[in-house]
């Protein structure tokens, strides 16, 4: 019953035919999306990646062709040879580009059949995701996934073309390298030739791209696969793709302009014109205005409204008047009933209560108690009559979070040094400042409340409604991150970014005396509250790199064991350099409006890092293990 393709060649893709093609003889090939049998007339909706065309088999085609059409089922692979004609006006399908024409079949070849399907790719109600991942080759036939994968291709091409035009070389770096942990665990590859020794799959090409700058290539980029053996979390992939680049002799703004350029090219693939340059905000401003280092600018910033309250009023509310009193505004939500407020409180992080951080959400009650105060709060925060207003402040007794009294070597400030700048409603003082642990709890707690409220009301009040313009996408650069973070458990400093990030020149003298006061020349590009990419100006001097390793508690012996090859390379005329890496998967997910990374990756893993289609990972034979000198000592249940 099945036919060979022979020397038959298709003349058109299924989605290409238009009314102007009427009268042509065509050869179409693809999958049967739907079959409708009306007796003497059989309709086949023929599908390939370009779209769908309707083929009709009439009695004039002959008994053999009619019998073949009767045998065809959904997802059979067929070839149709016939003549195109205009549809009758009352049968035109305006929902598809080919809806004005149909192909009257003279010949039908069945190139392959199809078993009963576990689900249909044309179903409007999706099957369970595990089933779809197991049969990914069927799931990938869905039009939505086809559009996503095509978009991924177009975005990658746009980025490549832009960077090529800017003089960047696309250079491949090794996949099998040495283990130099950068935070997450490495995926290790055992060596058969050298028993007991291992390669590692790269978490990023970090050191190789820096070595390319030492080698004089000036501008490098790569759209590269990376691997991280992270703890299992929703919507994370153990292998992912990033847009990686490095530049010699840059300032941070040099990197910013390059990234803005290729993101503008990427967004143009969906018809969105981004406005550049992106605004900049220091880490300190982000924490003070948004309570997070990945601010979502689609929502109003928080505002410190202490000035609206008399001191005795705050004390009567058991609020500490010496600490920030933060107003959060959620647009267009209006006032809520007591029941609605009670339901909202269930969304707030439990640790707010543990830290004695108060959420004052009954503004009517506050206005009755302090009639002059709420109008001032609204003025300072920009809240309107249709907005929902919440105030977050510190209780007068701090219960802490189990870490009170534990301090880094340089004092009570956590997260290091911050540069303040101007902010909304005069919210951020000028000059240099530190945040105490208590202040940080308040800002971050308020930031969590702000996000919880936004997520709760997003759909109901169309907070994040997409309008198909650049205003849907609020991008910014966050700069001046702390160089180090204090680890309470280990009682030592860790690199906040990675240990190859350069400190600010003005802070070099604090590396040994006050590491918490050192700012990094690090920067993130953030879109609508999501980090798209992270980068920095790198250390190009061996003496400074050694100081950073020392500040991280790394002995000279450990430095040599882990990074000796790189420390050696730094001594051979290394130029100043810097770069960034952005997640391609996440960029495409945002552009596609997808809910999950798995919707824009052709062959993704589950949240448990399993490939259900090929059933990986799997045990290997004892012979393979013996060749590698490996013994399996036990399995951990996931």
Where are these regions (language model features)?
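Class II aminoacyl-tRNA synthetase catalytic cores and aaRS-like
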Residues: 1-638
């Amino acid at each position: 019953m099945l036919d060979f393709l022979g020397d038959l060649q298709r003349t058109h893709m299924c989605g290409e035919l238009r009314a102007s093609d009427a009268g042509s003889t065509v050869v179409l090939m693809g999958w049967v999306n739907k079959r409708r049998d009306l007796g003497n007339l059989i309709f086949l909706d023929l599908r390939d990646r370009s779209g769908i065309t309707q083929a009709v088999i009439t009695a004039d085609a002959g008994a053999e062709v009619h019998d073949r059409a009767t045998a065809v089922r959904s997802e059979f692979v067929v070839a149709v040879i016939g003549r195109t004609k205009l549809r009758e006006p009352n049968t035109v399908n305006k929902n598809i580009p080919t809806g004005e024409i149909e192909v009257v079949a003279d010949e039908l070849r069945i190139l392959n059949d199809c078993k009963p399907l576990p689900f249909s790719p044309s179903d409007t109600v999706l099957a369970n995701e595990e089933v779809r991942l197991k049969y990914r080759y069927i799931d990938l036939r869905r039009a939505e996934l086809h559009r996503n994968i095509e978009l991924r291709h177009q975005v990658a091409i746009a980025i490549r073309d832009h960077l090529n035009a800017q003089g960047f070389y696309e250079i491949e770096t090794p996949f099998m390298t040495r283990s130099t942990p950068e935070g997450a665990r490495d995926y290790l590859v055992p060596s058969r030739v050298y028993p007991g020794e291992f390669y590692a799959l790269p978490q990023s090409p970090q050191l190789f791209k820096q070595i390319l700058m030492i080698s004089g290539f000036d501008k490098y980029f790569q759209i590269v696969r990376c691997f991280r053996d992270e703890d299992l979390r929703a919507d994370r992939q153990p292998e992912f793709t990033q847009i990686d680049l490095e530049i010699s002799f840059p300032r941070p703004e040099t990197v910013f302009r390059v990234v803005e350029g290729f993101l503008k090219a990427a967004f143009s693939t969906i018809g969105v014109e981004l406005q550049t340059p992106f605004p900049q905000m220091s880490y300190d401003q982000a924490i003070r205005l948004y309570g997070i280092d990945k601010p979502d600018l689609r929502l109003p910033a928080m505002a410190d409204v202490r000035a609206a309250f008399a001191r005795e009023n705050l004390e009567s509310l058991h609020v500490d008047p010496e600490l920030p009193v933060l107003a959060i505004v959620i647009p267009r939500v209006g006032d809520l009933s007591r029941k609605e407020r009670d339901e909202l409180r269930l969304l707030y992080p439990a640790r707010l209560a543990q830290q004695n951080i108060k959420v004052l959400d009954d503004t009517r009650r506050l206005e009755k108690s302090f009639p002059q105060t709420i109008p001032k709060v609204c003025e300072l925060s920009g809240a309107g009559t249709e907005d929902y207003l919440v105030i977050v402040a510190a209780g007068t007794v701090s219960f802490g979070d189990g870490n009170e009294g534990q301090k880094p070597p340089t004092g009570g400030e956590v997260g290091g040094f911050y540069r303040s700048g101007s902010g909304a409603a005069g919210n951020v003082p000028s000059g240099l400042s530190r945040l105490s642990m208590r202040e940080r709890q308040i800002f971050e707690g308020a930031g969590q409340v702000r996000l919880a409220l936004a997520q709760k009301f997003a759909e109901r009040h169309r907070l994040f409604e997409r309008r198909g313009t650049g205003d849907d996408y609020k991008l910014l650069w966050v700069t001046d991150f702390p160089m180090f973070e204090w680890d309470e458990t280990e009682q030592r400093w860790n690199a906040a970014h990675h240990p190859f990030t350069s400190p600010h020149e003005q802070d070099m003298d604090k590396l040994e005396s006050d590491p918490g006061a050192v700012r990094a020349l690090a920067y993130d590009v953030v879109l609508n509250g999501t980090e798209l990419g992270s980068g920095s100006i790198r250390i190009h001097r061996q003496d400074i790199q050694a100081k950073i390793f020392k500040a991280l508690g790394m002995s000279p012996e450990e430095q040599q064991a882990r990074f000796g090859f790189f420390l050696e390379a730094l001594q051979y005329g290394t130029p100043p350099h810097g770069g960034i890496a952005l997640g391609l998967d996440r960029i495409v997910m945002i552009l596609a409006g997808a809910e999950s990374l798995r919707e824009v990756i052709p062959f993704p893993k589950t949240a448990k890092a399993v490939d259900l289609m090929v059933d990986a990972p799997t045990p290997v034979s004892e012979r393979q293990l013996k060749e590698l000198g490996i013994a399996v000592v036990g399995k951990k249940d996931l």
